[in-house]
């Protein structure tokens, strides 16, 4: 029996630091340079080109470098979400230490770039159009607080969704018993369905993280 339901999220074990699982996607990326392009690779390239076009619509045609950055972030989160669904592999994106380290630096860089390059627009964005003069200080304070909590909500959303799915899988797995074949069959079938949903959640959350970060940058 598990000592704790959250023991599956422990970052270390007696064998090896589980944080090294974050490097597994790099192995697949390096191997792809020496492999003959296959149909899955062409499909992945088509998806990435579609994401690049979508990011260009949100951030402008002159944002090619920023597009590469957010798409690389999307791939990193997606790979870590996927490998975390396999048995005995640590889910790095279920920890705020990882999600915050991805969201906060990008958010700070976007904020600094905006305030340095477009100071007037940044100041105007703090006060919505048509705000009465007595409410302007309050609106400025609210806008500052809203901007400051954006990376936190972005990180918590990703980590919470990853934790919720893994907890459900763990709870279902703990209900199966070898003595009752009927109950075990139901549990296994339920886990398969839930695992398929978790793969969908992994894709959706990676896309949401990338899209919201792009929208924050475009503002």
UniProtKB/Swiss-Prot annotation:
Major place of residence: mitochondrion
One MF term in the entry's GO annotations: proton-transporting ATP synthase activity, rotational mechanism
Keywords recorded for this protein, A-Z: ATP synthesis, CF(0), Hydrogen ion transport, Ion transport, Membrane, Mitochondrion, Mitochondrion inner membrane, Transmembrane, Transmembrane helix, Transport
Membrane topology classification: Multi-pass membrane protein
Any one cellular-component term (Gene Ontology): mitochondrial inner membrane
Database matches in Gene3D superfamilies: ATP synthase, F0 complex, subunit A
Pfam families assigned to the protein according to its UniProt record, in alphabetical order: ATP-synt_A
Stored CDD domains: ATP-synt_Fo_a_6
SUPFAM superfamilies to which the protein is assigned, alphabetical: F1F0 ATP synthase subunit A
Transmembrane segments: 16-36, 57-79, 96-116, 122-142, 158-178, 184-204
Location of this chain's protein in the cell: Mitochondrion inner membrane
Record's keyword annotation contains Transmembrane: yes
InterPro entries assigned to the protein according to its UniProt record, in alphabetical order: ATP_synth_F0_asu (IPR000568), ATP_synth_F0_asu_AS (IPR023011), ATP_synth_F0_asu_bact/mt (IPR045083), F0_ATP_A_sf (IPR035908)
Subunit structure: F-type ATPases have 2 components, CF(1) - the catalytic core - and CF(0) - the membrane proton channel. CF(1) has five subunits: alpha(3), beta(3), gamma(1), delta(1), epsilon(1). CF(0) has three main subunits: a, b and c.
Function: Mitochondrial membrane ATP synthase (F(1)F(0) ATP synthase or Complex V) produces ATP from ADP in the presence of a proton gradient across the membrane which is generated by electron transport complexes of the respiratory chain. F-type ATPases consist of two structural domains, F(1) - containing the extramembraneous catalytic core and F(0) - containing the membrane proton channel, linked together by a central stalk and a peripheral stalk. During catalysis, ATP synthesis in the catalytic domain of F(1) is coupled via a rotary mechanism of the central stalk subunits to proton translocation.
PANTHER family on file: ATP SYNTHASE SUBUNIT A (PTHR11410:SF0)
Protein family membership: Belongs to the ATPase A chain family.
Protein name: ATP synthase subunit a
């Amino acid at each position: 029996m598990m000592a704790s339901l959250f023991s599956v999220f422990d970052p270390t074990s007696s064998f090896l630091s589980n944080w090294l699982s974050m490097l597994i996607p790099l192995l697949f990326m390096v191997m792809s340079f020496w492999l003959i392009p296959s149909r899955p690779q062409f499909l992945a390239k088509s998806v990435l080109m579609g994401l690049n076009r979508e990011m260009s619509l949100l951030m402008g045609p002159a944002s090619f470098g920023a597009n590469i950055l957010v798409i690389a972030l999307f791939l990193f989160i997606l790979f870590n979400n996927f490998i975390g669904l396999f048995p005995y592999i640590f889910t790095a994106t279920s920890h705020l230490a990882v999600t915050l380290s991805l969201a906060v630096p990008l958010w700070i860089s976007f904020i600094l770039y905006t305030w340095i390059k477009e100071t007037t627009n940044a100041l105007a964005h703090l006060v919505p159009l048509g705000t009465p003069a007595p409410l302007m200080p309050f609106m400025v304070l609210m806008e500052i607080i809203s901007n400051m909590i954006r990376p936190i909500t972005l990180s918590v959303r990703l980590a919470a969704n990853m934790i919720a799915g893994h907890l459900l899988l763990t709870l279902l797995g703990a209900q199966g018993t070898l003595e009752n074949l009927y109950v075990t069959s139901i549990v296994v079938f339920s886990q398969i369905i839930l695992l398929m949903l978790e793969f969908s959640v992994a894709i959706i959350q990676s896309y949401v993280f990338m899209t919201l970060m792009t929208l924050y940058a475009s503002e």
